[in-house]
Amino acid sequence: MSALRPRISLPLDLHLAGRRPEIEVARHTLRPAGRARLDALVATPAEPRGVLVYFPGFNTPLGPWETAKCQYLAQATSMQVVLTEIPGMSRYGDPIPRAIRAEMLRGRIGAWADLNLAYLSAAIDGGWVAHTATVQALGYSTGCSLATAALPALAELGPIDGLNLVEPVAISRRNLASLEAHNMLDFGRMPLVLATNLGHDWVMSAYRRQWREPSVKYGPADLLAIATVLSGEELSWHLDDIELARCALARGSRSSLCRRADFEKVDASLQARGIGGPTVTVEGLGHQLWHSFPVVTHLIEAMLA
């Protein structure tokens, strides 16, 4: 085990520490410079010491489920938490602009990340996010790619305290058929993940209320563009070009989308560059581990607290 990059194995622990945090989460609708609408959530703890920019995964509606995650993140880090819907995957159903989609179909994420940053900037310019003395970024799945690509721009807000990547996908080169096969394998593990929430009444209440909320909408052209970005290794390339002091990594031991060999390669590269941070493995679960509230709370503590 490296002191610089400690290895942490998290057993599947169904315990959910404490009650749901009572932290205010505000919802905003953003439309910067005439662009399509996206929703944003901002969670503000008492006396925040910085901002945590959270980049969610594919097909993530900003309802009761994500609201509760924001509250936990804000409580564990004492940071203001901000996230937006992913451009091209919103409750409003507006597509990714054609020029940006064309770049994504070439495997390039930069223009899409810039579009996402425009919405984050709108939240900051609106005065809803003001605590930027330090900045952390957190991504899950697709959000890992957006977080990594956005990090140089986020550094303009304030000093980057850390990058936190849960189940990064775009660290492996594979064709679209393989990506979909791995996605289906992991999707088959979803019932086990959701079962970890049973017995926690307020979590299940949030889950049921989430199903009554509008889902995000996206078209086949945008789905293909996002899949193309995720089927390459651009996240790893961006990470190699970024200067940072700390990067925490996490994956599920049974994950197919975040392959172990490629995950280990990213960890080894960070180690060789002297970049600290834990490398966490959640035992017994796959890619969808972020849908388990017990796992989320333990991961937040291991990676961010």
Predicted regions and their residues:
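Conserved strand-to-loop "acid loop" that flanks and positions the catalytic carboxylate
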Residues: 249-255
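Catalytic histidine-centered segment of alpha/beta-hydrolase-like enzymes
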Residues: 283-295
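Active-site nucleophile elbow and catalytic-triad environment of alpha/beta-hydrolase enzymes
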Residues: 34, 221-239
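Flexible "cap/lid" loop of the alpha/beta hydrolase fold
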Residues: 148, 152, 160-191
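Conserved alpha/beta-hydrolase
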Residues: 74-100
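Conserved acidic catalytic loop of the alpha/beta-hydrolase fold
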Residues: 110-134
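Conserved alpha/beta-hydrolase "acid-adjacent" motif
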Residues: 256-265
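The serine-hydrolase catalytic nucleophile loop
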Residues: 59-71, 261-262
